Amino acid sequence: MFTAMIHGILLALGLILPLGAQNIFVFNQGASQPKFRGAIPVIVTAACCDTLLILLAVLGVSVVVFTIPALQTAIFIIGLAFLLYMGWSIWKSKPAKLDRREAALSSKKQIMFAMSVSLLNPHAILDTIGVIGTSSLSYSGLDKFIFTFSTMVVSWIWFFGLAFVGKKVGDADTGGKILTAINKISALVIWGVAVYIALKLFNLV
């Protein structure tokens, strides 16, 4: 049981720590929102999406989904469109004006964009299937539950912590220069993921 828990925690950390579109977006909204509670929608959405992907990976459902070419192509196309739009929305925001309410995205956009970088990112989905889904096959019964639950808990703690750190950075950035740089970097990372998806889509068609 203890081994399954440690395995789940380390595995989840290994997958979630690298700089990616999802992490960048959560951090960005933590920094941009005037109050921490303003970032709750993106935190909860990102964590819920990760929880869903982990469950699907452990249950083997996601593997079945990616064996359907038409569905895979549709996910790639929708994901590409969302990421391009999302990158543009973040790029054009102007936190340097010191009006963080203007720079921050609405709850609706936070939820929509968080879902797009989580559920419509083939790279993230394949990582979850290939690593967490495959690793879960080593366990059964209570150990499998502990392994799965541990990976989920790491996601929730990570996203709350990431947004909190972003909020502290945003509070310290009275001139708006750091937030401006964060927005530009965020948009570039998100567009980079979009290019990756576009290349994958090109190979499919």
Where are these regions (language model features)?
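Juxtamembrane transmembrane-helix termini in multi-pass membrane transport proteins
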Residues: 2-73, 130-146
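Helical-face signature of the major facilitator-like transporter fold
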Residues: 8, 12, 110, 114, ...
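Residue-level hotspots within the lipid-embedded alpha helices of multi-pass solute transporters
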Residues: 12-16, 51, 118-122, 152-160
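Membrane-interface helix-boundary motifs at transmembrane edges
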Residues: 33, 37, 171-179
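Membrane helix-loop-helix hairpins that form the core translocation module of multi-pass transporters
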Residues: 37-112, 165, 185
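Transmembrane alpha-helical segments of integral membrane proteins
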Residues: 55, 156-172
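Selective transmembrane alpha-helices of multi-pass membrane proteins
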Residues: 67-98, 152-159, 174-205
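Selected transmembrane alpha-helices and immediately adjacent juxtamembrane segments
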Residues: 112-128
